[in-house]
């Protein structure tokens, strides 16, 4: 089981004034009894209203991180943290998609199988006049030293 993170001290992305205003409106809309809390079902609906569609796993992770008292109800400050966590997860998903796109462009497969030639990576860097020491990067990433990079090796190289 993953360690519980103190998300109130965690470095989460800031929300813009517009995003905070949308959070207030969405929270108020779903806090029908004015109790200052919404339940998990209402949380999913509120997130959808804000254009966020987390998976069941994402919902579980977010709720377990913000529901400090285990009430299964979310207060406004916890709701804001949920939005921040979801925003952070979305950014990570976008980064993963960019990595996969680059892997495929270099010869890998969409299902993260296949491999890319280190020589092809080197020639692309040279073609775009990138001042990257490919050999030094690959030395750490190409674990089996076979001149190819698997998806995991390529992702490690970019991180």
From Swiss-Prot:
List, alphabetically, the SUPFAM superfamilies matched.
EF-hand
Which InterPro entries did the record assign?
A: CALM/Myosin/TropC-like, EF-hand-dom_pair, EF_Hand_1_Ca_BS, EF_hand_dom
| Pfam families assigned | EF-hand_7
Keyword Repeat attributed: yes
Indicate where this protein resides in the cell: Cell projection, Cilium, Flagellum
Residues bound to Ca(2+) 2: 67, 69, 71, 73, 78
Q: Looking at the keywords, is Cell inner membrane present?
A: no
The GO terms describing molecular function are: calcium ion binding
Annotated Ca(2+) 1 binding sites:
31, 33, 35, 37, 42
- Keywords in alphabetical order, please: Calcium, Cell projection, Cilium, Dynein, Flagellum, Metal-binding, Microtubule, Motor protein, Repeat
EF-hand domain mapped to chain residues = 18-53, 54-89, 129-159
Which PANTHER family does the entry link to?
Answer: CALMODULIN LIKE 3 (PTHR23048:SF0), MYOSIN LIGHT CHAIN 1, 3 (PTHR23048)
Subunit structure, interactors included: Consists of at least 3 heavy chains (alpha, beta and gamma), 2 intermediate chains and 8 light chains.
Q: Briefly, what is this protein's role? A: May be involved in the calcium-mediated regulation of dynein motor function. Binds 1 mole of calcium.
Name of the protein: Dynein 18 kDa light chain, flagellar outer arm
Look up and give the organism this protein is from.
Answer: Chlamydomonas reinhardtii
